[in-house]
A protein has these predicted regions:
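Beta-strand-loop-alpha "switch" segments that mediate conformational coupling across diverse proteins
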Residues: 51, 60-103
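C-terminal boundary of histidine-terminating zinc-finger modules
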Residues: 96-118
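Inter-motif core of Ras-like GTPase G domains
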Residues: 3-21
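Short, charged, surface-exposed secondary-structure boundary motifs
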Residues: 23-29
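Short glycine-/polar-rich loops that comprise or flank the Walker A/P-loop
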Residues: 9-12, 49-54, 80-82
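C-terminal alpha-helix
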Residues: 33, 119-131
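Structural beta-sheet core signal
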Residues: 15, 55-58
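Short mixed-charge
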Residues: 36-51
Length: 144
């Protein structure tokens, strides 16, 4: 219940999707939950976006494998529901160290890992936050 309350308190979900068959299969449950969150929010605010998912983030991506590339193509097909970020590469060492130390990846990762986090942040700002600002501007104009 805590996850649901947290989601409802926010503006939507950033959904990490592992670039594996299991990752795509897990999306079914995530999308069902996101729809429930959206319906609950719609009762309070009818201006809720069509999708409660704000950004799909492909994770654990290994560009060298055919399987990961195929799954990434499937994830890209979700663009109609929400923007899809560039994939986050599979880096077991830095990710494990960050988890073990309970610190952000930027503190234990290499330059490439830090650049990926910066790129993801920039994509979020451009594709989600800017879109929200534009939509809010349109809604404010309609209200006037």
């Amino acid at each position: 219940h805590l996850a649901a309350l947290g989601a409802l308190a926010g503006d939507g979900l950033l959904v990490p999707v592992e670039t594996s068959v299991k990752g795509v299969e897990a999306l079914v449950g995530v999308m069902e939950a996101a729809q429930e969150y959206r319906e609950a929010l719609e009762q309070v605010d009818p201006r809720v976006p069509r999708s409660f998912v704000r950004l799909f983030i492909p994770t654990k991506f290994d560009a060298r494998t055919l399987g990961d590339n195929r799954v990434l193509e499937k994830i890209a097909g979700l663009e109609d529901l929400a923007p899809v970020a560039s994939p986050i590469a599979y880096r077991p060492g830095p990710h494990r160290r960050a988890t073990e130390r309970a610190v952000p990846l930027q503190l234990v990762g290499d330059r490439q890992a830090r650049e990926e986090v910066e790129r993801l942040t920039e994509e979020f700002l451009q594709r989600v936050v800017a879109q929200d600002a534009a939509r809010e501007g349109v809604l404010e104009e309609v209200a006037e």
